[in-house]
UniProtKB/Swiss-Prot annotation:
Organism: Bos taurus
Spans of repeat WD: 91-134, 142-185, 188-228, 234-275, 304-341, 359-399, 408-441
Family: Belongs to the WD repeat ESC family.
Subcellular localization: Nucleus
Modified residues (Phosphoserine): S2, S34
Top-level taxonomic group: Eukaryota
Oligomer status and interactors: Component of the PRC2/EED-EZH2 complex, which includes EED, EZH2, SUZ12, RBBP4 and RBBP7 and possibly AEBP2. The minimum components required for methyltransferase activity of the PRC2/EED-EZH2 complex are EED, EZH2 and SUZ12. Component of the PRC2/EED-EZH1 complex, which includes EED, EZH1, SUZ12, RBBP4 and AEBP2. The PRC2 complex may also interact with DNMT1, DNMT3A, DNMT3B and PHF1 via the EZH2 subunit and with SIRT1 via the SUZ12 subunit. Interacts with HDAC, HDAC2, histone H1, KMT2A/MLL1 and YY1. May interact with ITGA4, ITGAE and ITGB7. Interacts with CDYL. Interacts with BMAL1.
Protein name: Polycomb protein EED
Principal place of residence: nucleus
Gene Ontology CC, one term: ESC/E(Z) complex
Modified residues (Phosphothreonine): T55
Length: 441
């Protein structure tokens, strides 16, 4: 398997269209989507930002802060250009916190993405000429549920796409859009779940991070909790984000305690735990599966950010992370020449390689994304502006940026997602609006 290869789903998994499903009880409503290719038909009110509670006060940067690492990454003209071709609005009018394209589809399959917000999960299909078609909508039985995050995978037996969703109630739900059912759910976290991620090479390994200060690794094939990361040296406050590296050997997590922590899952102990989770069969034993409790991260730092760290992603062996300080920081544990796999837990050095600067993004829970090939980086701010950086540059100082704005998009953009072929960028906002930007070739 080449470095950036993800197993794809065979054909024959087209999703049934335009159905509204209940996640567990009866509820009748149809999403009234004011989507139209005609700009003037789009109703978007830009208003106050609905922040997730307890937003930290954003303290101005301390003097001399900008001389970090090798200084600012000056933005030159980006080679990518996008055009806004459509927007629509979900009828619940609550913030949409998450959006994800399904990257497990085959070439030629329709481009499907999911949005989450309020107690709603909605699936859409992108068509030519900017059309966004509603496929399915799911409503949680609890009106107080608020979904924050979603992640796609596929069933390794049937090849059906699967969507995991979670939020304020701390329950992970797995939805099969082919059968249009919530096929399983996991309860374990003691509080809200802020992010879900599937392992890049094993479609059954699901990582969840929570307000309960811990990360959990689940095997959704055998319904086992493989490990809990947290405790003695774990996060001291909500975990807000985490990411697997490309090979799925390491996890980097971050949270409200301003820290970033590295957890290796290719250790003997963890490899064994994952193997045992596959071997476990509750029908053949009375004993419950024993989950690993990982109290000590393999590296930890609080030297990158001075506020809540709400998004982290691997870029090769480097880390991209952001706080509510108007910059995404590119850094690595240890010194420049150190091998990431030889970093010791006692390592106190970090090397900051540069920053992607932007403005008006000082509320928390605003997440950036990259395209499949990690050639582009996208982030929205709290006044509806999108920043796209070209990562394909020799020198990161020369990272080129393009900003995308539309006069009717004025609400906070919570998350963005690129289609697998990078042709479409979707942004979701606090006013329940969805914006489609198509890349101009």
């Amino acid at each position: 398997m080449s470095e950036r290869e993800v197993s794809t789903v065979p054909a024959g998994t087209d999703m049934p269209a335009a159905k509204k499903q209940k996640l567990s009880s009866d509820e009748n409503s149809n999403p009234d989507l004011s989507g139209d290719e005609n700009d003037d038909a789009v109703s978007i009110e830009s208003g106050t930002n609905t922040e997730r509670p307890d937003t930290p006060t954003n303290t101005p940067n301390a003097p001399g802060r900008k001389s970090w690492g090798k200084g600012k990454w000056k933005s030159k003209k980006c080679k990518y250009s996008f055009k806004c071709v459509n927007s629509l609005k979900e009828d619940h009018n609550q913030p949409l916190f998450g959006v994800q394209f399904n990257w497990h589809s085959k070439e030629g399959d329709p481009l499907v993405f999911a949005t989450v917000g309020s107690n709603r999960v909605t699936l859409y299909e992108c068509h030519s000429q900017g059309e966004i078609r509603l496929l399915q909508s799911y409503v949680d039985a609890d009106a107080d549920e608020n979904f924050y995050t979603c992640a796609w995978t596929y069933d390794s037996n049937t090849s059906h796409p699967l969507l995991a969703v979670a939020g304020s109630r701390g329950i992970i739900r797995i939805i099969n859009p082919i059968t249009m059912q919530c096929i399983k759910h996991y309860v374990g976290h003691g509080n809200a779940i802020n992010e879900l991620k599937f392992h890049p090479r094993d479609p059954n390994l699901l990582l969840s991070v929570s307000k309960d200060h811990a990360l959990r690794l689940w095997n959704i094939q055998t319904d086992t909790l493989v490990a809990i990361f947290g405790g003695v040296e774990g996060h001291r406050d909500e975990v807000l984000s985490a990411d697997y590296d490309l090979l799925g050997e390491k996890i980097m997590s971050c949270g409200m305690d301003h820290s970033l922590k590295l957890w290796r899952i290719n250790s003997k102990r963890m490899m064994n735990a994952i193997k045992e989770s596959y071997d476990y069969n509750p029908n053949k034993t009375n004993r419950p599966f024993i989950s690993q409790k990982i109290h000590f991260p393999d590296f930890s730092t609080r030297d990158i950010h001075r506020n809540y760290v709400d998004c982290v992603r691997w870029l090769g062996d480097l880390i991209l992370s952001k706080s509510c300080e108007n910059a995404i920081v590119c850094w690595k544990p240890g010194k420049m020449e150190d091998d990431i796999d030889k970093i010791k837990p006692s390592e106190s050095n970090v090397t900051i390689l540069g920053r992607f600067d932007y403005s008006q993004c000082d509320i928390w829970y605003m997440r950036f994304s990259m395209d499949f090939w990690q050639k582009m980086l996208a982030l929205g701010n709290q006044v509806g502006k999108l920043y796209v950086w070209d990562l394909e540059v020799e020198d990161p100082h020369k990272a080129k940026c393009t900003t995308l704005t539309h006069h009717k998009c004025g609400a906070a953009i919570r998350q963005t997602s690129f289609s697998r072929d990078s042709s479409i960028l979707i942004a979701v906002c606090d006013d329940a609006s969805i914006w489609r930007w198509d890349r101009l070739r």
